[in-house]
From Swiss-Prot:
Catalytic activity: beta-nicotinamide D-ribonucleotide + ATP + H(+) = diphosphate + NAD(+); nicotinate beta-D-ribonucleotide + ATP + H(+) = deamido-NAD(+) + diphosphate
CDD domains, alphabetized: NMNAT_Eukarya
Enzyme class: transferase
Full protein name: Nicotinamide/nicotinic acid mononucleotide adenylyltransferase 2
Organism: Caenorhabditis elegans
Known cofactor(s): a divalent metal cation
Keywords: ATP-binding, NAD, Nucleotide-binding, Nucleotidyltransferase, Pyridine nucleotide biosynthesis, Transferase
GO biological process, one term: NAD biosynthetic process
Length: 223
């Protein structure tokens, strides 16, 4: 049986049930193809990721991810990425965790990246300075050396995005696409932040432990 660990990266600003379901659905699918998932890792980005005023400090975000995963027996929060002083490329985060996972579980354990379809759609995004948000060679390595699992998201079309990229389109068949048939959700961190600012309830869209942390620290009151 093949063994892998799953990595989810992102702002987690705040973490939602959709983030947790993404990992759960990925694991459930892998189990049907004779693959054991030994661990799930949620890695928030560092504060240097961007200068958006909505991105709260990483010390708050990592604590929320810890709260969100507290009851899980296989998903954990990791602060390596978010405590670095500079932004870290996803490929380097994967390499870091693969090394640690193999030390912990054995050299045969692989590492796979789990993302939403909206992240794949960002593969072709051009930044204001004209540079690419994603490096094509990084994407190629993620797909061929690690493994990419994509959860379908509302309004995203990851397959079309991949097919539009000459450097990686030939690897479409290596990407695992999954869909949450049990609990499809349009919940997002953006919607939660807006709801909090507008004094609306976010109960059941994120674990109660996260809600309590947000309330205790007076987070997202202004956007």
């Amino acid at each position: 049986m093949k063994r892998v660990a799953l990595l989810a990266v992102g702002s987690f600003n705040p973490p939602t049930i959709a983030h947790l379901r993404m990992l759960e659905v990925a694991r459930s699918h892998l189990e049907t193809i004779n693959t054991q998932v030994v661990e799930g890792i949620m890695s928030p980005v560092a504060d240097s990721y961007n200068n958006k005023p909505t991105l709260i400090k990483s010390n708050f975000r990592i604590q929320m991810v810890r709260a969100a995963t507290k009851s899980s027996d296989w998903i954990r929060a990791d602060d390596w990425e978010c405590t670095r002083t500079t932004w870290t490329r996803t490929i380097d985060v994967l390499r870091h965790h693969r090394e640690l996972v193999q030390e912990k579980f054995g050299s045969d354990v692989g590492m796979m990246l789990v993302v939403g379809g909206d992240v794949v759609d960002s593969f072709t995004r051009i930044l204001p300075d004209g540079s690419n948000l994603w490096n094509s060679s990084d994407i190629r390595t993620i797909i061929t050396e690690f493994g990419l699992i994509v959860l379908s998201r509302e309004g995203s079309n990851p397959l079309n995005t991949i097919q539009s990229m000459p450097a990686i389109s030939e690897f479409c068949d290596r990407i695992i696409q999954v869909k949450d048939e049990v609990c499809p959700s349009g919940v997002s961190s953006t919607r939660l932040r807006a709801a909090i600012m507008n004094k609306k309830s976010i109960k059941y869209s994120t674990p109660d432990e996260v809600i309590n942390f947000i309330r205790e620290n007076n987070l997202y009151q202004k956007i």
